[in-house]
């Protein structure tokens, strides 16, 4: 299984969520609402979940082994960092243009 596409939208909130992503697996299956969270030990990827009536969060979809989780996390965080570098370049270009 390979992550063949990552679509990511950065969010600017007061909380710890930094972005929301959708991934495509093997050009055949899409998973939406994956979140990039700024945790105590750095960024991590949280799979889509819903709140149960008793207040617990349950994953809607999630990898069943650490290798697959690693592939998903690497793909999403690489895209997150790539977009951050693009934004920095745009900000520097705009600052230099005036």
UniProtKB/Swiss-Prot annotation:
Transmembrane segments: none
GO terms, biological process: asexual sporulation; division septum assembly; sporulation resulting in formation of a cellular spore
Signal peptide: none
Taxonomy, superkingdom: Bacteria
SUPFAM superfamilies: SpoVG-like
Keywords associated with the record: Cell cycle, Cell division, Septation, Sporulation
Family: Belongs to the SpoVG family.
Function per UniProt: Essential for sporulation. Interferes with or is a negative regulator of the pathway leading to asymmetric septation.
Descriptive protein name: Putative septation protein SpoVG
Protein source organism: Bacillus pumilus (strain SAFR-032)
